[in-house]
Amino acid sequence: MTKEVIDLRSALELLESIPGQMVHTDVEVDPSAELAGVYRYVGAGGTVARPTKTGPAMTFENVKGHPGAKVVIGLLASRKRVGYLLNSKPEKLGFMMRDAVKNAIAPVVVDKAKAQCQEVVHLATDEGFDIRKLIPAPTNTPEDAGPYVTLGMCYASDVETGESDVTIHRLCLQSKDEISMFFTPGARHLGAFREKAEALGKPLPISISIGVDPAIEIASCFEPPTTPLGFNELSIAGAIRGKAVELAPCVTIDESCIANAEYVIEGELLVGARVREDQNSNTGKAMPEFPGYTGPANAELPVIKVKAVTHRVNPIMQTCIGPSEEHVSMAGIPTEASILDMVERAMPGRVQNVYAHSSGGGKFIAVIQFKKTVPSDEGRQRQAALLAFSALPELKQVILVDEDVDIFDTNDVLWAMTTRMQADVDIVTIPGVRCHPLDPSNDPACSWSIRDHGIACKTIYDATVPFNQKARFQRAKFMEVDVKKFLPDFTVQD
């Protein structure tokens, strides 16, 4: 690709140049439920309730209640599109991200004069200040607790060490200057920073950058152990682009933000302050989450007190639907990279590729392509699966297949499971292991082996052919031909 992607705008320009990757509408859309309802049909995919499909990204150019605002959705809701945006073959994205972690380029802080995100500044002390009017954040369903920022790059630092981190969190706009922030239990990344600051009685400065280079959005989804506490994931995005991500000093807090973001929210996580997530809707629901279900509202969530909202001239809001293919891309590609890295270090050359399948939202299920080259490799495929669970503790199921199976083709994977697996010997269960709280089946009500919500029975499906049986499982081999000789306009399906 000749177009260089450095921010959201250049990403959109690239997609505009590729047929079928972007659509627009200037028909007025209500950001409350209607916008997400439209995109569900256009291109959400993932674990969204059917009917849905993987389709183009979409820009809404006439947003009710927000004159002049634009909202873009689905930028990453296609693996092929992510390949365009990161300049990689879709099937090689996991390898590219693995290499980026190893060759990290730390972010740099630039002068405020270069901060495009601060072309317009709104202070919380300004008359009429209201984040709900300044930011066209959608409400995905009629049951949602409120409007959510779903693609905010949350950036904060350890109050003692100064180490910084960036992550994406569930952010609900609660009032004119307050946002609730959901943390997955376990105090990873910013959660650990918040707990330390609160224990010391200090508010935690935090910036939320919205509308950034897609490389940043995907890099921010890495988790321990691949990126341990204090590892700044912006350095992964730097490696992808071959140059450091530029940060700028915030206007009202002692923290940095992404300099070319479309919007930045500046604020502080308050000490001891908590808010009921659905205080404004009273639905008992939060928002649609990546497993495909609407998450329950939390009774008590930490509160961000907003100090300012800054943005570029004519800013573009970016959002996503929680269960969409967009989440699969953001969470799944780092999952693949993490598994590839851990297994390759333990048994070089055996794992050929990994796919974090859409049905698990990019987190719950992975298909591993394993190549057995010598008799002693028999059984090592299951060791690879165990390593995958260590690489991503939230992973619930692993499907193992041979190198002749296309892991990105669900029919091919199911074919392998149907013709190469016997359930009594090829399914390995590991009960009582911590997994993810947003999977509703990870609950004592669903199994006697589960003692606490968030615990699961992890499962390995070994659909690989035993090494000494390979001769009996050869796939039919067809003649290689040039189809275009017979059908000049024919295109091989990718």
Model-predicted segments: where are they?
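Extended, highly charged
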Residues: M1-V303, K307-D494
